[in-house]
Amino acid sequence: MIIKVMVMLLIELTYAFIFVIIAVLIAYREKLGIEKKILYVSILALIQLFILGFVLLYIFSFGMVGAFLMIGVMITLASYLIMREINLKNKTKLFICLFITFLTTTIVSLAVLTIPKVVKFEPIYVIPLMGMVIGNTMNTIHLALDKIIDMVKSERDILWGYLALGATEIEALRPFIKNAVKSAVIPQMNRTKSVGVIFIPGAMVGMLLSGANPIYAAEIQIIIMWMILSSAVISGILICYLMYKEIIRA
């Protein structure tokens, strides 16, 4: 049975690989110089997703303990990746604050979804949903920190002006935080307002392909979109306030 399933997977993936071949041929024809990169990222995605599939099969056997361990690993990796990219001196504090921010948005999202039983408190639901939260929160945090650091560096005279007039560091930084978070959340707001009109999002597509009721699929998808939008706002504001001293001295 397992061999039959694997053979079917290989056949289906072989057909689907036509998309990659088309992209490579066009890149080669137009001399874009990215043919090897297209092949590399495509094969890398294949390997990573299959590894993820086998890891999830193993984790699901441990129940919610395995789910929490998986979420902990995702939060740790997300914190490390952003810490490495953001140009702030105190990397240790940045990592801790990033971890706290990811953990906060994850706990809030998990509580809102599972306490009223909007979704079942099971690994098969919790892991992918929290993965969506962490992944989208990564983008918002990165954009917010990049934006506020650039603003502080380019408009330092304005910041010192607020401080000279007697404002506290938090009060002086608040206008910068406001603009940075607004900029960081705009991409998610655009995705939220265009969902169902311009594109059908991944979670809903997956449910429809698995034979779910379209109305139920739409309900779950809008819950996910609201959850991600909320997490984006919370994470953007929280990380800026937690790191305000380091941001001012950037």
Curated annotation (Swiss-Prot):
Localization (cell): Cell membrane
Taxonomic superkingdom: Archaea
Family designation: Belongs to the UPF0014 family.
Any one of the GO CC terms: plasma membrane
Chief place of localization: membrane
Protein name: UPF0014 membrane protein MJ0938
Organism annotation: Methanocaldococcus jannaschii (strain ATCC 43067 / DSM 2661 / JAL-1 / JCM 10045 / NBRC 100440)
Pfam families assigned to the protein according to its UniProt record, in alphabetical order: UPF0014 (PF03649)
Topology class, membrane: Multi-pass membrane protein
InterPro entries: UPF0014_fam
Membrane-crossing segments per the record: 6-26, 49-69, 95-115, 124-144, 195-215, 222-242
Keyword terms, alphabetized: Cell membrane, Membrane, Transmembrane, Transmembrane helix
